[in-house]
Design a protein with these regions (language model features):
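Small-residue (G/A/S/T)-rich helix-start motifs and N-terminal tracts that mark the onset
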Residues: 1-68, 79, 175-330, 334, ...
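N-terminal small/polar loop signature for handling phosphorylated ligands or for N-terminal nucleophile
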Residues: 55-134, 271-283, 291-299
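Short, acidic/small-residue loops that bind anionic groups at enzyme active sites
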Residues: 66-73, 124-145, 324-341
Length: 375
């Protein structure tokens, strides 16, 4: 990869050193995750991913474990580093098979293809990956499961199904995007000497956030403050019988730091919401009320509309009013998007910032494109 090349040629860390660090991290991570390495089969290709695999076989052997290698690559295609690691393994007397071994293993380690794979897997390599998947053993992938496109997560003919993927320097995008994510199992990034700063200014690098990052992303609470200091959110959610959608979306607003949350919902939902979320302000409608809605829009710092809103005439009138009169940021989700798909020109009436949050089916309705085209 480019990150490897930068580290080798610009920083000066030799490729074999990176390979050694990778192998050490793979073995250590397997131990931390309680993967049984008592009897391991490492399936190696001809490239540097295969070199990592040969190094893993050596380290496991040095730890007193039984490690065999299935060499699935071609001698003529061996990279310099992979050839070196293979020679070391052979010098140590570790078994290197070229045919499927008739033995049982506690773990199968996939080191056939790395991030550079961009072609469909067929023939011998397909047979190897399919055979690995059939084995009754825990399965670990080196950097990315063989057969997954590192950039898109697409399956290139067939792919290794891992329980654990040990990713060098960072989790590859193909392990986060489906269907690749479902093949990667648990993806764990490990440091091997590639400077994280290398990724900081690259446009092809993506960042993911999890629950642990939430506190870092939200502004700190000031000691001299009150609930009015942290914004007023108007949730226009919940048609009759859809109190749950109104409740869950309001909870989300509180979770990300909203000070005041007002739910504008069908009157049938009032009692349930007052019991479920007594801290929220509940405003209700039985029929469309232009003046009431305009007053609420003036009150809000942020408007969220759509969750459980329904597809009826009242809901449609509410959405039209919001897009015409809202002056603060507006998030449109769920039924709000479905209503919008009937009349996308409504967006042209809105002068406020609008955020749309469609899933694939909603995006298909909005654009008129099939889900396959969008994907």
């Amino acid at each position: 990869s480019e990150a490897d090349a930068h580290t080798i040629h610009e920083i000066g860390i030799p490729s074999l050193v990176l390979m050694e660090r990778a192998a050490l991290q793979i073995v250590e991570t397997m131990h931390k995750k309680n993967i049984s390495t008592e009897k391991s089969l490492i399936v190696c290709g001809s490239g540097n991913n295969g070199g990592d695999g040969f190094a893993v076989a050596r380290l496991l052997t040095e730890q007193g474990k039984h490690a065999d290698v299935l060499f699935a690559g071609k001698e003529a295609s061996l990279s310099e580093e992979c050839r070196c690691q293979k020679q070391i393994v052979e010098n140590m007397g570790i078994s290197v098979f070229t045919e499927f071994p008739d033995e049982e293993y506690t773990v199968i380690i996939d080191a056939v293809f790395g991030v550079g794979l961009c072609r469909e897997i067929t023939g011998h390599y397909k047979d190897v990956i399919d055979w690995m998947n059939l084995q009754d053993a825990e399965k670990v992938a080196v950097d990315i499961p063989s057969g997954i496109c590192a950039a898109t997560g697409k399956i290139l003919g067939t792919a290794f199904r891992a329980d654990l993927t040990v990713c060098m320097a960072c989790v590859k995008l193909g392990c986060e995007l489906f269907p690749g994510k479902s093949y990667a199992g648990e993806s764990i990034p490990v440091a091997i000497g590639i400077d994280p700063k290398y990724f900081s200014n690259r446009l092809d690098v993506c960042y993911t956030f999890d629950k642990n990052d939430l506190g870092k992303l939200l502004p700190s609470r000031m000691m001299n403050s009150h609930k009015g200091s942290y914004g007023k959110v108007l949730m226009i959610t919940g048609s009759p019988g859809m109190a749950g959608a109104a409740f869950l979306s309001a909870c989300a607003a509180y979770t990300v730091g909203a000070g005041l949350v007002q739910i504008y919902t069908a009157s049938e939902n009032r009692l349930a919401l007052q019991e479920l979320l007594p801290e929220a302000i509940i405003s209700c409608y039985d029929s469309y009320d232009d003046s009431q809605l305009s007053h609420l829009l003036d009150w809000a710092d942020v408007v969220c509309i759509g969750c459980g809103l329904g597809m009826g005439q009242i809901s449609e009138k509410i959405l039209k009013n919001v897009l015409k009169n809202v002056s603060c940021p507006c998030v449109i989700d769920a039924d709000g998007l479905n209503l919008l798909s009937r009349n996308i020109e409504l967006l042209n009436q809105c002068c406020a910032p609008v955020i749309l949050t469609p899933h694939m089916k909603e995006m298909s309705r909005l654009t008129g494109w099939s889900i396959d085209t969008i994907c």
